[in-house]
Amino acid sequence: MARAIPDAGFEAVPFGCDPWLLVASGEALLLPHVATIFALGNGFVGLRGPGDGAGKPHVYLNGVFEKVPIAYHEAAFGYAQESDLRLSVADATRPNISIDGVAMGGPVRIELDMRRGVLTESFVVKGIAVQIERLVSMSRSGVIASKISIDCSDAQRVLIEPKVLPPPSPKATFDPSITYDPRVAPPLNESQWIEGQAIETELHCGRVDRLPASGFSVAAVSSTATLITDGDADKLDFAIFAAYAATRDGDPLGDALTALSDAWAAGFASLAVEQSDWFERHWAKSQVKIPDLPAAEQAVRYAQFQLVQAVCRDGKASIAAKGQTGEGYEGHVFWDADLYVLPVFAFTRPEIARAMLVWRIAGLDAARSNARMMGQSQGALYPWRTIDGAECSSFFPGGSAQYHINADIAFALRTYVEATGDRSILDEGGAMMLVETARIWLEIGYHDPAHGDMFVINRVTGPDEYSALVDNNLYTNMMAAAHLDYAAEIGLAAQLIDNDEAVRMRLAATKIYLPFDEAHGIYAQDDGFFNRQ
């Protein structure tokens, strides 16, 4: 029986066909996903676009999370015990703006300029035009800069007052009528944040909040110069800066205040030039042109734009499944980061691909622990979903059983090395990661006499996570063979394995079993694929 897929309710949004711009106005601004589509980020800070409304989660920090226990009605051996959970942090990006006592509402037009990395929002308050240009600096890790321009010719009083809002309250109700994915985590009933210190001086305001289980402290600060004008200017331009910093082993406030001070001293115009220059260099290496198809070119460019905004570039985190746009999938990193995202950067921005591999290598000890938890006596098993390195999946059959994640990471490593010629990553932990992850295949697979002594891998889940715990998933077996072959080559060269282990790896790769269905003349997804109704 075919599974009905629920209608997500999304409609086409008229964003225009300019290859460099996305524009929304009119009814398009009312659609629920506009705030996601117009999100900004720099790999550390993620800022949702306009449309969510006041008090809604708005700002996220890549790699910052809280640890929360996973509750099972009946747990079993190998089940993850806790999850990493991305939470929205304090919001230092949205000042109070009012004209003649009327607070500014939602924008009438928003424009995302992918050439410059700037989002422009246009408002009308009592017939007076207001424009806010905003950027999340690609050159300054935690910095957000905004320029507010107001036509004051008909205004008697303009008030611009920066503020820092506390982290929003968590979602406290679970509506099964609109939740179709069993892997969605249950809601939190109370805030996970512990408020530390609040700061307010003549120059800045802010706060420091702490997540007790993970140990993260997060500082959010904003410039605080409050501007009040009483009809003495025809045009007003005013810049506001915000900065974020996070740490697990110190006080982030000093770092945030330093970043804020440096941004203030540079000024918005200078930061806008920095941003434009950064993207000019990026597009020189990454730009895709599709002649005579501006909408297609726009779509491809937008995908590239969001990738580079979402990926961490310092090796301390990676790229979440939903990027920096929200809390979807709890902010977890999945295997799509290695198989789909990293190759893009390997051929366009190899330093970013390298940083993604550095993060994976740093997780090797956690992957070894995960393998022991899953009952393997040797090797390393990377988690299906994680932020900090431990398995966070509470959906064991479709999650932890996806052993192919090891081969996906090996594919990413090989792609990077062959695309760039940079073999130093192998000496810096890449070769060890490759070998340790390959050893898992020799643990869970075996040469099966029933299949002509071919090497089989049973009771695993492939990319089709709705067909869980199958024998000889085609994708898994093909990827495992390539993984084993490469690990034998690199492991021998690095003297991490002996000849006997290399022979075992190569034999398994050569004799990997691939389920071919003679009746249909095609390879099956797994051994039991054609027996399903």
Region roles according to the model:
Residues L47, S270-E418, Q533:
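Substrate-binding groove/exosite segments of carbohydrate-active enzymes
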Residues T325-V333, A380-E428, E436-L507:
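The feature captures the catalytic groove of carbohydrate-active enzymes
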Residues I70, P168-P176, G326-G331, A362-N370, ...:
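Short, mixed-charge aromatic SLiMs
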Residues A2-L40, V45-P50, A54-Y329:
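Acidic/polar, glycine-enriched structural segments that form the non-catalytic walls/loops
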Residues Y302-Q309, W359-A366, M432-I444, A482, ...:
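Alpha-helical scaffold segments in carbohydrate-active enzymes
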Residues A28-Y72, Y340, G389, A401-Q402, ...:
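C-terminal capping/lid segments that line or modulate ligand- or cofactor-binding pockets
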Residues V333-A362, E428, D485, E489-Q533:
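Active-site core of glycosidic bond-cleaving carbohydrate-active enzymes
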Residues Q131-I132, E161-K163, S318, A355-W359, ...:
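Beta-strand segments within the central parallel beta-sheet cores of soluble alpha/beta enzyme folds
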